[in-house]
Structure formats: structure tokens, C-alpha cells
């Protein structure tokens, strides 16, 4: 008899919960009209940023494409007249991108940055393949004063290895053997 009474009590408790929720106002947000507040660290669409001088930051080092778990980033490196590398073309397939942010972490020049913009819905899947021209923005992104090309990426003819500022002399590996 005790177990029957507990079953009736549990059933009545469930009905009471349902009865209370029956008179509450439904919480429905109409998405396109009412945007949800996103967290500060939201990662979504990738952009390519520029230097404070206005030049492209990407040096086509292929680190972003190597670290990408879904292989959605592809590019081709080229060299400018002054000896600096740049991406001749840069392509991201957002149909495959999982917005993990590994490409942003791997980028040594802070060229790739993830923005909180996430509304990239398209009916044609080919429109989700973004080229370099679609990804380049006219600002520095999160790192306003960072200028990778100020020192790096420029060939210098000032002495040999180990003779530059803040550079150690080369180590002879054979002399370090035990």
C-alpha cells in the first residue's frame, strides 16, 4: 500500500508542476528581430587584418592551414619585390569551418582573427567559400599597434649568422655531443 501511495504522490507532483507552467507566459524570442547577446569571447567568421601601415599582415606561412582540423584553409605563397612573402591567394571554406580558433592562435603575424559575426547562412554552398578579397578588412583588428613587418620578413645583408642584434651565434652540434 505504501508504494501505491508514493506513486500517486509522484503523479500528483508531476501534474502540479505541469499545472503551474500552464499559466506562465511562454518565453519565445523571435530570432531575426531580437538578437541574442553574445559572450565577449565568441568566435565566428574569420577575417584577415592589416598592419597599421595598411599592408597585409599574412606572410603565407601555412601554419593556419596546417593546424586546421578540417582543412578548410588553403593559400598560395608569393614573394614581393622587397623580399617579403604574402599570400597570392587565400581561401576559406566556411561550409567546413568549425570556428575552433586554432588558426588564430597559430598565426604569427596576428593576420587571422575571429569576429563575433556568425550569420553566414547561404542557400548556395559555393557562396560560403571566401576569397582573400572577401576576408580582408581595413583595420588592425584586436592588435591595433602590432606591426610584424617592422622587423620580420625583411631580408638583411648585415653580416652573417649570429652577427645581428639580439641573435646568438650558431651552435656547432658536433661539439655539443657527449
UniProtKB/Swiss-Prot annotation:
GO terms for biological process: aerobic respiration. The keyword Magnesium does not apply. Binds 2 [4Fe-4S] clusters per subunit. It is an enzyme of class 7 (translocase). Keywords: 4Fe-4S, Cell inner membrane, Cell membrane, Iron, Iron-sulfur, Membrane, Metal-binding, NAD, Quinone, Repeat, Translocase, Ubiquinone. Its EC number is 7.1.1.-. Pfam families: Fer4_7 (PF12838). One of its GO terms (cellular component) is plasma membrane. The keyword Cell membrane applies. [4Fe-4S] cluster 1 binds at residues 58, 61, 64, 107. Its main location: membrane. Coiled coil: none annotated. It is found in: Cell inner membrane. Belongs to the complex I 23 kDa subunit family. NDH-1 is composed of 14 different subunits. Subunits NuoA, H, J, K, L, M, N constitute the membrane sector of the complex. This is NADH-quinone oxidoreductase subunit I 2. It comes from Syntrophobacter fumaroxidans (strain DSM 10017 / MPOB). The gene is nuoI2.
